[in-house]
Amino acid sequence: MPREIITCQVGQCGNQIGMEFWKQLCMEHGINPEGILEDFAVNGEDRKDVFFYQADDEHYVPRAVLIDLEPRVINGIQKSAYSSLYNPENIYIAKHGGGAGNNWGRGYTDAEKVQDEILEMIDREADGSDSLEGFVLTHSIAGGTGSGFGSYLLERLNDHYPKKLIQTYSVFPIENDVVVQPYNCLLSIKRLTLNADCVVVLDNNALTSIAVDRLKILQPTFSQINSIVSTVMAASTTTLRYPGYMNNDMVGLIASLVPTPRCHFLMTGYTPLSLDQKFNSVRKTTVLDVMRRLLQTKNIMVTGAVKKGAYMSILNVIQGDVDPTQVHKSLQRIRERKLANFIPWGPASIQVALSKKSPYIDSGHKVSGLMLANHTGIRSIFKVLYDQYRTFRKRDAYMNIFKQTKIFEDNLDEFDSSDEVVKSLIDEYAAAEKMDYINWGNDDDDMQFDPREPPKFSNIQ
């Protein structure tokens, strides 16, 4: 039985990458922009019901809630070819339409004001599911709506659905994208640490470099970057939609990648990557070639994260017509060449999930691969943002912007709490590189968690 997943798209970036994700899913499942199943896709062996439901007229509708505090992006979706795909009851645009002004505090406060309306949408979707497994949140952590509204939504989902999984696709910013982004990011990372079960980190710097260096696009547009993100999102859900023997639900995917509760931030790699089939590389794709390329720094979508540190876990999702014996031989070669450095206290193994490719898309290559990896080097992206925050905070730079919002009008305790959580997260990823990690935090009476505690999802039946 399919286990359904509800997607929440929050803010400009969240809705843009969400839109590209649904376009990709429609193509892969043979669904046209109006939600009608194409004649050639009637007898498919896929699980559409994980992400879609069928309305009374049998057209497919995404299990999605679209949220923004300013209308431009969602209005664009409603005027696009996919306008009739979504359930209009699941769209929220703030009546004031003024956005959050790149202020986490405004986004968070606005979310609190309309929480009943948003939760009613989500509850309605949940009630329409036979066996809801969890939620996916798409957002950016740099601006105001994706970060602030997204943070509040994470807290409420965790409270409201304590036994359901929460996975996010979180876009981390380009340097100096928003002047107050160090504040917005720190406050968001606290919620991603405490209220999500798995966070896929999408680094805008790395995505831009990949577009320039690998796809030879001199000035990548938002649409082209979002297309790369949608490729990763679709590939990471392919085992749920085209199930095999393993990793065919969200629990299985996350459990294989997250060894301890807070170390749940993942990086991704994808190959071969192309936005236009005409520009596909002329090369023979083999399992070994794909798996070797996935470990190369230039293919990883977090800047510089794997240059230092060690892998805690790796899951490669290989799509295409693949002989399992090729996988075994490829893993042996990678082990012999020591292409991946693992932490000393866990299994040094790459897990592989084989998945079918959509029969409705001609990708131009026989084998493609996605790497989902938990690597201690991910802390470098947190450290950069944390250091920027500390620099701003010492000078109280731009703090008056936040003091104008309800959550900060009396005190700045929320900043201090977020500082502590993010610093602890950075320290834990550093400690995870050492053999005695199992004892990390035992001497600290103020620790809010035990790193040896099993993740939430391990107890879900």
UniProtKB/Swiss-Prot annotation:
Coiled-coil portions: none
Keyword entries, A-Z: Cytoplasm, Cytoskeleton, GTP-binding, Microtubule, Nucleotide-binding
GO biological process, one term: cytoplasmic microtubule organization
One cellular component term from this protein's GO annotations in UniProt: gamma-tubulin complex
SUPFAM superfamilies linked to this entry: Tubulin C-terminal domain-like (SSF55307), Tubulin nucleotide-binding domain-like (SSF52490)
Subcellular location as annotated: Cytoplasm, Cytoskeleton, Microtubule organizing center, Centrosome
Tree of life domain: Eukaryota
Binding locations of GTP: 142-148
CDD domains named among the record's database cross-references: gamma_tubulin
GO molecular function (one): GTP binding
Function recorded in the entry: Tubulin is the major constituent of microtubules. The gamma chain is found at microtubule organizing centers (MTOC) such as the spindle poles or the centrosome, suggesting that it is involved in the minus-end nucleation of microtubule assembly.
Similarity comment text for this entry: Belongs to the tubulin family.
Name assigned to this protein: Tubulin gamma-1 chain
Source species of the chain: Euplotoides octocarinatus (Freshwater ciliate)
